[in-house]
């Protein structure tokens, strides 16, 4: 059962990472297309340079967001496995005391 939970968590992490990569790719493509549009309408070399810099900034931001999402997904996978260890049960219904010793 434990390995099944780990496999499910890994699959979920992989799917989330694929989605993050796809989103970043779309953002980078949109940035490139926007740059081309701005360069076509710009007459001044300075405006063309500003369009290129804006594209680069958007591409870096998309890459940063992708990496942040991957780190978040890895952390989420780790927290999924935390609650799967051994549990202690209480017979006194008092939190913090195992098997009824002390407390009441």
Curated annotation (Swiss-Prot):
Residues 75-89 have a biased composition (Polar residues). It holds the Pfam family LEA_1. Keywords: Stress response. One of its GO terms (biological process) is embryo development ending in seed dormancy. It comes from the Eukaryota. Residues 1-104 are annotated as: Disordered. Induction: By abscisic acid (ABA), osmotic stress and heat shock. Maximally expressed in dry seeds. Also present in mid-maturation embryos. Residues 1-24 have a biased composition (Low complexity). Residues 25-74 have a biased composition (Basic and acidic residues). LEA proteins are late embryonic proteins abundant in higher plant seed embryos. They may play an essential role in seed survival and in controlling water exchanges during seed desiccation and imbibition. Belongs to the LEA type 1 family. This is 11 kDa late embryogenesis abundant protein. The lineage of its organism: Eukaryota, Viridiplantae, Streptophyta, Embryophyta, Tracheophyta.
């Amino acid at each position: 059962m434990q390995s099944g939970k780990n496999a499910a968590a890994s699959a979920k992490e992989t799917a989330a990472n694929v989605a993050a990569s796809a989103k970043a790719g779309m953002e980078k493509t949109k940035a490139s297309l926007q740059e081309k549009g701005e360069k076509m309408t710009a007459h001044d070399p300075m405006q063309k340079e500003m369009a290129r810099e804006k594209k680069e900034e958007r591409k870096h931001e998309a890459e940063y967001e992708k990496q942040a999402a991957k780190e978040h997904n890895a952390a989420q996978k780790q927290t999924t496995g935390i609650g799967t260890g051994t549990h202690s049960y209480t017979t006194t219904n008092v939190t913090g005391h195992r098997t009824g010793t002390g407390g009441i």
